[in-house]
Amino acid sequence: MASLIQVRDLLALRGRMEAAQISQTLNTPQPMINAMLQQLESMGKAVRIQEEPDGCLSGSCKSCPEGKACLREWWALR
């Protein structure tokens, strides 16, 4: 089980990562990683970076059956 400090340190080493990548790297369940990232965000230590829909090549993200699954969410330290 990873700690909040390990999540912070991993973000410091890698720059920015997705929650799934952090979960896999630290061998910790993703819901736990999501909670830790939200805690870091509320403490002002981490920031959530969401891709803009402008990057969609087909321009049809709004009507995508996967519900914007192509838009990735990254985390980085402030």
Curated annotation (Swiss-Prot):
Transcription regulation among keywords: yes
Induction statement: Up-regulated by S-nitrosoglutathione under anaerobic conditions. Repressed by the global regulator Fur.
GO biological process: iron import into cell
UniProt-listed InterPro entries: FeoC, Tscrpt_reg_HTH_FeoC, WH-like_DNA-bd_sf, WH_DNA-bd_sf
Keywords: DNA-binding, Iron, Iron-sulfur, Metal-binding, Repressor, Transcription, Transcription regulation
Name of a matching Pfam family: FeoC
Chain residues that bind iron-sulfur cluster: 56, 61, 64, 70
Molecular function per GO: 4 iron, 4 sulfur cluster binding; DNA binding; iron ion binding
Role this protein plays: May function as a transcriptional regulator that controls feoABC expression.
NCBIfam families: PRK15431.1 (NF011960)
Family the entry assigns: Belongs to the FeoC family.
Name this protein carries in UniProt: Probable [Fe-S]-dependent transcriptional repressor FeoC
Organism, scientific name: Escherichia coli (strain K12)
